[in-house]
């Protein structure tokens, strides 16, 4: 700490107040923005990498893929509980009312 030539007020020439809440908030914001930028970069790279690999695969195959029909039956299993073990499996049926 030194005194300014024209005044009697001490002047800090170095950072002595490193435990300031403002400094820690600025550092926290910097870390958060850095992580945000890193995640955006990773997502952009993954998207670009996926698009280029899909175009390479399509060029190598040279034909269109045929879509298989979807199974329209619901995949539901009902387990009827017994005393010690499940007694049987039930398959749901459609009721026409």
From Swiss-Prot:
Residues 47-97 are cytoplasmic. GO terms for biological process: amino acid transport; regulation of amino acid export. It is a single-pass membrane protein. It is found in: Membrane. Keywords: Amino-acid transport, Membrane, Transmembrane, Transmembrane helix, Transport. Its main location: membrane. It comes from the Eukaryota. The chain crosses the membrane at residues 26-46. A motif (VIMAG) lies at residues 78-82. Residues 1-25 are extracellular. GO terms for cellular component: membrane. Expressed in the vascular tissues, even in the minor veins of the leaves. Overexpression of GLUTAMINE DUMPER 7 leads to free amino acid levels accumulation. Probable subunit of an amino acid transporter involved in the regulation of the amino acid metabolism. Stimulates amino acid export by activating nonselective amino acid facilitators. The VIMAG motif is necessary for the function of the protein. Belongs to the GLUTAMINE DUMPER 1 (TC 9.B.60) family. This is Protein GLUTAMINE DUMPER 7.
């Amino acid at each position: 700490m030194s005194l300014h030539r024209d005044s009697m007020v001490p002047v800090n020439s170095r950072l002595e107040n490193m435990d300031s809440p403002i400094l820690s908030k600025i550092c926290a914001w910097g870390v958060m923005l850095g992580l945000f930028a890193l995640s955006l970069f990773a997502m952009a790279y993954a998207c670009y990498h996926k698009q280029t690999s899909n175009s390479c695969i399509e060029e190598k195959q040279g034909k269109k893929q045929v879509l298989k029909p979807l199974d329209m039956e619901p995949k539901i299993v009902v387990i009827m509980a017994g005393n010690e073990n499940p007694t049987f499996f039930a398959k749901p049926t459609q009721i026409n009312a």
